[in-house]
A protein has these predicted regions:
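Outer-membrane beta-barrel porins/channels
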Residues: 6-14, 33, 41-342
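Surface-exposed strand-loop-strand hairpins of Gram-negative outer-membrane beta-barrel proteins
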Residues: 1-30
């Protein structure tokens, strides 16, 4: 809002139902994350893999008849990543190896947000739901190294993933008499991950990982006007923004695995993920407890079924419209993996 210009009043009754607006919401939605990859050994020491994955994603929906509908009703971010990774193995000593790791990715990113707009805002009108749709494509890369000692099932890996820059283009609909063209610059954050595993006894494996993600690089994402002179908006004028104000993300995992026989093995893990929220979002600290079972019916075929139960911490959510308190929440995840060797 401009200094000295009062904000329009926020009613306490839902414009769609006429009933009092709810002060309690359930914003999280279920979503799935597919991943497909294929690896080929070009030589004894050189191997490459192509993959498809969806690295970034979120889906929340608080509904229309809530106080938070003035900030955002539904928010959805989807991504697609088409990548290739290669590794080259170099002998080190009598039994060890060092691997050089590298890869590139082509990524697509789409964002959607809907928001309740009251009367008295720019362009006038009655209560209505405005929507933001944007998308773009970008390229990222990664590089790293690994040390392996197969005799002890030991492997240590360090990988750096670059940021992926996007110049998001799209429209805001139902705010003005005609759709408004908007633009914004944002980058998917860079990250560094260290993984380690080693045998600790016959058929027993210990594993751990630490990952840092530069989420603090994402603060407020402004969407500015592009070619909207028909409604009196100059180029570069901010129309809306997505205020996140993240802090750095840290993810720490520890676990243990056991091979029961030639066909069955399992693993148990504990993961702590430091929330990126600074009070503007609900991404608080997360504890996740996972179990996995691997079944290998034959030499060239294996399956993995894994599940996790997590505890998402409580917090307070503050933005320009409202202040909300939320309690601890239960989160669950389930994954199924199949691997075929040719």
């Amino acid at each position: 809002a401009n200094p000295g210009v009062p904000l329009p009043p926020i009613v306490l009754y839902g414009p769609d139902t006429g009933r009092p607006m709810s002060s309690s919401v359930d914003e999280g939605k279920t979503f799935w994350v597919p991943k497909v990859s294929a690896k080929y050994d070009l030589t004894d020491d050189l191997a490459c893999a192509v993959q498809y994955r969806e690295p970034w994603g979120i889906h929340t929906d608080v509904g229309l008849n809530t106080f938070r509908s003035y900030t955002a009703i539904e928010q959805k971010i989807t991504s697609r990543d088409f990548g290739i990774n290669c590794s080259y193995r170099i002998p080190v000593g009598e039994k060890g190896y060092f691997r050089i790791l590298g890869g590139v990715s082509y990524q697509e990113l789409k964002g959607y947000q809907s928001k309740l707009v009251p009367p008295g805002t720019p362009f006038g009108g009655t209560f209505r739901v405005a929507t933001l749709d944007v998308e773009d494509r970008g390229v990222g890369w990664r590089i790293g190294g690994a040390y392996e000692l197969p005799e002890y099932a030991l492997r240590a890996t360090l990988v750096y993933q670059s940021e992926v820059k996007y110049n998001l283009d799209g429209t805001i609909s139902n705010l003005a008499p005609i759709p408004l063209n908007v633009n914004s610059d944002v980058a998917a954050p860079q990250s560094v991950e260290f993984k380690f595993q080693t045998g600790i006894a016959p058929d027993w494996l210990a594993m751990a990982s630490v990952k840092w993600t530069d989420w603090k690089s994402i603060q407020s994402i402004a969407f500015t006007s592009v070619n909207n002179t028909a409604v009196g908006l100059p180029n570069g004028r901010k129309i809306t923004s997505l205020d996140l104000y993240y802090r750095d993300g840290w993810t720490i995992m520890g676990g243990i695995g056991h091979k029961f026989n030639e066909k069955w093995s399992g693993a148990a893990t504990v993961t702590w993920d430091r929330g990126t929220s600074t009070g503007w979002t609900s991404q608080t600290n997360l504890w996740l407890f996972g179990l996995a079972a691997d079944f290998k019916p034959q030499k060239h075929l294996s399956f993995r079924l894994a599940g996790a139960v997590g505890w998402l911490g409580s917090g307070t959510l503050k933005d320009t419209v409202s202040t909300s308190d939320f309690g601890n929440d239960l989160v669950t995840a389930l994954s199924l993996t199949a691997k075929v060797k040719f």
